[in-house]
């Protein structure tokens, strides 16, 4: 039996689950709209801009929500800033060997780039606001600053999406610490849910069909990759995978794989792009991504050992 079965659970709550879910969407959505903005040149650039702006807004709001969720989960929320600033000196406090410190700084850095990106595109939606047409804000729209924000923000966003899985992997608990693929799984799942969230926004705003089609193409391919990584993750668990010979495993099989991955792939077969069908598929992908994190988080949380046997609560 893996020694991870003889450790105490950290007793994380639904706040952390929501943080994992929202953070993954925010991080990958930023990367996707940055890639979309970079790839949409010439006649394609103008139709793609509304989705780019929406994606940057969504990422910024997602960071704010993530920060709130992470803070509320602490036993003493008002002391969250102690993870970033030293109490007595007021200097920045970064501990590379502490996952929560790395994650907190990663969230703050990503938040900075989402703020700059959202501020830069807000002037396109609110051209009448004098502040948004000031020299510093207009400078953010120039090619070089815009590219720097997009590239560095995408890196920070991908880090945030994958970090949530790595945070679990370095916690010595069953399932979490028994596979090296958890960070990759959460990253790929975040990419699928990020694309799904953008598809829903694009369809509600009646966005350009070419832009929606690109997002659907990306989501379909990353769903296939997610399925492969999930299978590899379960195989990598070895004997620990028997944890899922329970209702958690049933939820993983039916809810995540069946409803959240295979059904959307089936509905999108043949490249059908009917708006209603795409909205249903995107909603199922989001549902599956949320269930995946719930299964991984709470299935391990509810494992405890009595004598020589493993029991789930």
Model-derived regions: residue spans:
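Short helix-terminus and kink motifs of transmembrane alpha helices
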Residues: 29, 33, 78, 126, ...
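Membrane-interface interhelical loops and short amphipathic "cap" helices
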Residues: 1-17, 45, 74-100, 165-183, ...
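Long, contiguous internal "core" modules enriched in hydrophobic/ aromatic residues
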Residues: 13, 20-25, 40-41, 47, ...
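Final/C-terminal transmembrane alpha-helix of multipass membrane proteins
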Residues: 280-302
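Compositionally biased, intrinsically disordered low-complexity regions enriched in proline and serine
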Residues: 6-7, 20, 57-58
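Membrane helical hairpin/interfacial module
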Residues: 25-85, 89-106, 113
């Amino acid at each position: 039996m893996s020694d991870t079965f003889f450790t105490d659970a950290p007793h994380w709550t639904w706040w952390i689950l929501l943080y994992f879910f929202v953070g993954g969407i925010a991080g990958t959505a930023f990367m996707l709209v940055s890639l979309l903005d970079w790839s949409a040149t010439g006649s394609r650039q103008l139709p793609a801009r509304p989705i780019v702006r929406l994606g940057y807004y969504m990422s910024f709001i997602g960071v704010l929500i993530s920060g709130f969720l992470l803070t509320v989960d602490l036993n003493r929320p008002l002391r969250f800033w102690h993870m970033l600033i030293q109490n007595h000196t007021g200097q920045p406090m970064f501990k590379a060997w502490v996952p929560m410190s790395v994650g907190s700084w990663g969230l703050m850095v990503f938040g900075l780039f989402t703020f700059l990106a959202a501020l830069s595109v807000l002037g396109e939606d609110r051209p009448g606001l004098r502040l948004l047409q000031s020299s510093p804000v207009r400078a953010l729209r120039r090619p070089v600053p815009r590219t720097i924000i997009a590239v560095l923000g995408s890196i920070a966003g991908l880090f945030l999406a994958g970090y949530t899985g790595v945070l679990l992997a370095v916690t010595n608990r069953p399932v979490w610490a028994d596979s090296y693929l958890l960070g990759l799984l959460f990253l790929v799942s975040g990419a699928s849910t990020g694309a799904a969230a953008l598809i829903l926004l694009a369809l509600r705003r009646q966005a350009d069909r070419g832009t929606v089609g690109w997002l659907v193409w990306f989501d379909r391919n990353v769903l296939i990759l997610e399925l492969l990584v999930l299978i590899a993750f379960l195989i990598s668990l070895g004997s620990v995978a028997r944890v899922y010979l329970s209702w958690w495993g049933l939820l993983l099989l039916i809810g995540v794989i069946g409803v959240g991955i295979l059904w959307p792939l089936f509905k999108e077969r043949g490249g059908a792009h009917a708006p209603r069908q795409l909205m249903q598929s995107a909603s199922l992908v989001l549902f599956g991504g949320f269930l995946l994190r719930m299964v991984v988080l709470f299935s391990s949380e509810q494992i405890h050992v009595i004598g020589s046997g493993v029991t789930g609560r």
